[in-house]
From Swiss-Prot:
Protein species of origin: Nitratiruptor sp. (strain SB155-2)
UniProt xrefs under SUPFAM superfamilies: Adenine nucleotide alpha hydrolases-like
Function: Catalyzes the ATP-dependent conversion of 7-carboxy-7-deazaguanine (CDG) to 7-cyano-7-deazaguanine (preQ(0)).
Biological processes annotated in GO: queuosine biosynthetic process
Binding positions (ATP): L7, S8, G9, G10, M11, D12, S13, S14, I15, T16, A17
Descriptive protein name: 7-cyano-7-deazaguanine synthase
Length: 220
């Protein structure tokens, strides 16, 4: 059995990859370089986690995201919010990013004969991104299967979607995921800022799980 795992190198996607391995799949890890601020650090983390899993890898460049912009993750003229998580869709949302990622992953899955795509989206304890919602994932699965060969039957698996960050941290520790090799910060590549939404969620998760996050932080 083969599964394509969308692996950013972040904590959630890395734990998702280990879940796929636990489920008995041969892992095909796919990483996207799309002009994000922490592109090099994420790529380093991806390679480290994929190496731990002995996964076949694809590193896909999607430079057109920089032409689209419209997100603080890509456009350095838009500041990364550091006031805490607020209601609504934040400026760190990248327009339809997961839809595009899933489409590319589906093409790879069809080529490789994989029956599943794993993605580490989290609905309940996230920044409110619309492309992390379960309804969206279900509709993408239907669209993928409608637009591929008749014998293709791909399931999109989201093992973390209803978990809170502390549960995700505990799961990662129980699976032996080297969380110190993962990277979540939206802004920095040397030391995590400790203030962006992603850092705040990660730190809160470790704190509530009663565990220590071993990556370096500028501010905690």
């Amino acid at each position: 059995m083969k599964a394509v795992v969308i692996l950013s190198g972040g904590m959630d996607s890395s734990i998702t990859a280990y879940m796929a391995k636990k489920d008995g799949y041969e892992i095909i890890a796919v990483h996207f370089n799309y002009g994000q601020r922490t592109e090099q650090k994420e790529l380093e983390a991806f390679r480290a986690i994929a190496g731990e899993l002995n996964a076949k890898t694809y590193e896909i460049d999607l430079p057109f995201f920089e032409q689209i912009g419209a997100s603080a993750l890509i456009d350095t003229n838009i500041a990364i919010p550091k006031q805490g998580i607020e209601p609504g869709i934040p400026v760190t949302y990248v327009p339809f990013r997961n839809g595009i990622f899933l489409s590319v992953a589906a093409a790879i899955a069809e080529k490789e004969g994989a029956d599943s795509i794993y993605i580490g989206v989290v609905e309940e304890d996230s920044s409110g991104y619309p492309d992390c919602r379960e309804d969206f994932i279900q509709k993408m699965e239907s669209a993928i299967n409608a637009g591929t060969k008749p014998e293709t039957d791909i399931k999109i698996k989201t093992p973390l979607i209803h978990l809170r960050k502390e549960d995700i941290v505990q799961l990662g520790l129980s699976l032996g995921v080297p969380l110190e090799k993962t990277w979540s910060c939206y802004e920095s590549e040397d030391e995590a800022c400790g203030e962006c939404d992603s850092c705040r969620l990660r730190l809160k998760g470790f704190e509530k799980a009663g565990a220590k996050d071993k990556i370096p932080y500028k501010s905690t």
